[in-house]
Amino acid sequence: MRKIKIAQIGTSRYSHGSSIFASLCEQKELFEVAGYAFPENEDEKFPEFKEQYAPYRRMTVEEILSDPTIEAVAVETEEVYLLKYAKMVAKAGKHLHMEKPGSPNLDDFRELVSILKEKNLAFSLGYMYRFNPKVKELLSRVKSGELGKIFSVEAQMSCKHSKEQRAFLSDFPGGMTFFLGCHLIDLVYQIMGEPTAVLPLSRSTGIDGVHTDDLGMAVFQYENGISFIKASDNEVGGFLRRNLIVTGERGSLAIQPLEYYPALPESDKQTATMNECFDTAVWQAEWTKETSLPFDRYDSMMKNFAEIVRGKENPYSYDYELRLFELVLQACGK
């Protein structure tokens, strides 16, 4: 199988650049890593990553974009710079993987999608739950009609982060709704489709004197129900309470926790647990549960990217990604 020659532009402290680079390097049967670039003074801002990248060729952005043998690029800069470099990659005619959801500028995102469409380039975004095996199972079962009419999706993705990371949320409209809530909006949109209205509800807790929107929330209205997402950056124990709950007329599915690391520190692979109930007759019906085999969220994501670069139909179209980005901004009050 032909390897895809790929480079990475950028990394960041609070997103997944180092994990994506590690996945590219480890999946040697899929990728040949040409090198990396650290724009925007990332050497000075993120010295903790130098050792990880040191064995690979340091390049400039211009060297990556002008190298005809490099056919794909992962853009993993800080969020505010994502669309700047993504557009450069697309204009250079290279396939693109980009950290989610992009910089908070709709015109720039529309321009990016237009370039990608015109050049027929692969486009992948870092929405990690798309490749969670239990999420994939849930989406398949919803699509099959097993739950009947769906009237509610609830999704939570919370954590307890440092004062410094909560201050960083000032970079975005809606704070946590933009930063992590976008993962959940992706799930709501896949299951429920186009909402009739979006109600942004993000707030600042003010804890530690930080006045960013560290409590993200949004409600999505539909003709036959309501769905909501919540992403708090101040929730003690929030990681294991991350969930996706889908309620239909015939039954309910709940993935909780959405991810769990059962073997830290020996292994950073995750598992996910599906809970389900289809007993409509018993008031206190018990839920059954099943936990997935261990998986790596980034390996599955980048394997999918390799497949669409090679010509597999992208399950997430350009138009889907654009409309999702618009919904994310609406949920953030923009």
Predicted regions and their residues:
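Beta-loop-alpha module in the N-terminal Rossmann-like domain of NAD(P)-dependent dehydrogenases
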Residues: 53-115
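C-terminal helix-rich "cap/oligomerization" subdomain common to oxidoreductases
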Residues: 1-3, 9, 37, 72-74, ...
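Contiguous beta-strand/loop segments that form the cofactor/metal-binding neighborhood of enzyme cores
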Residues: 179, 186-262, 302-312
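Rossmann-fold dehydrogenase core element
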Residues: 111-129, 149-153
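Active-site loop of classical SDR/Rossmann-like NAD(P)-dependent oxidoreductases
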Residues: 41, 237, 289-303
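Predominantly a Rossmann-like dinucleotide-binding segment in NAD(P)-dependent oxidoreductases
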Residues: 12-13, 129-209
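N-terminal Rossmann-like dinucleotide-binding module
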Residues: 1-52, 306
